[in-house]
C-alpha cells in the first residue's frame, strides 16, 4: 500500500497515456512542485460526482502519473505534460488542510500485454488515424502491435462516456478491453 497525492479530473488516464494539464489552483501547483522536486508521481482519478474545482467524489480506480515536461503560461498558469504509469485501486482518501486529496492506494498487478490479434487490426488502423491528428502524440512511438497500448490510446481518444472509459480502465485484460471497445464502436460503424 502507498500514498499518492490525487488529482481528480473529468477524464480517465490510462497507463502509457499522455495528459496535458493547465494547473492554477495553489494546492495543485504545490503538488506539482513537490512531484518535480522528488521525482514523485501523483494519482489521476476520474470524478464520479462534483467538479474539478472544489469537492468531488471519485471512482475507486485510477492511474499514477509522472510529469515529463512543464512550462510556465501567462496568468500564473503552469502547463504540465504527464504520462500514465501504473493503475491502482483507491482504498481511502483524506483531504489535507490545503484541500489536496491524498489517497491510500493498492497497486494493481501488472498484466503482460499480448500482441495484437488479427481480429483487432482494424482497431489499430483506426488508432493510427486518430494519433496522427493529436499533436502531443506526434513524437511518440506508436507500438500498434501492442494490445494494451492500442486499447489504452483508443480509450483516451475515442468519444466514449466517462463511465465507459472508467469501466475500460478497470478491465484488466488488454484483449478483453479491445473486445469491449470493438463492441462499443459497432453501432457507430453500422449506423
Question: What is the predicted function of each stretch?
Answer:
Residues 1-191:
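N-terminal low-complexity, acidic/polar interaction/targeting segments
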Amino acid at each position: 500500500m502507498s500514498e499518492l497525492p490525487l488529482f481528480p479530473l473529468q477524464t480517465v488516464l490510462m497507463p502509457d497515456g499522455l495528459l496535458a494539464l493547465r494547473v492554477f489552483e495553489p494546492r495543485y501547483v504545490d503538488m506539482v512542485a513537490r512531484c518535480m522536486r522528488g521525482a514523485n508521481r501523483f494519482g489521476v482519478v476520474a470524478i464520479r460526482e462534483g467538479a474539478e474545482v472544489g469537492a468531488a467524489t471519485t471512482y475507486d480506480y485510477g492511474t499514477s502519473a509522472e510529469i515529463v515536461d512543464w512550462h510556465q503560461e501567462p496568468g500564473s498558469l503552469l502547463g504540465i505534460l504527464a504520462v500514465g504509469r501504473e493503475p491502482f485501486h483507491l482504498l481511502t482518501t483524506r483531504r489535507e488542510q490545503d484541500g489536496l486529496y491524498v489517497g491510500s492506494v493498492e497497486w494493481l498487478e501488472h498484466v503482460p500485454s499480448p500482441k495484437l490479434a488479427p481480429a483487432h487490426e482494424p482497431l489499430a488502423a483506426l488508432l493510427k488515424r486518430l494519433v496522427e491528428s493529436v499533436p502531443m502524440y506526434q513524437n511518440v512511438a506508436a507500438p500498434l502491435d501492442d494490445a494494451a497500448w492500442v486499447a489504452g490510446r483508443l480509450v483516451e481518444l475515442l468519444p466514449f462516456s466517462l463511465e465507459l472509459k472508467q469501466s475500460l480502465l478497470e478491465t484488466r485484460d488488454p484483449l478483453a478491453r479491445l473486445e469491449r471497445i470493438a463492441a462499443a464502436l459497432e453501432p457507430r460503424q453500422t449506423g
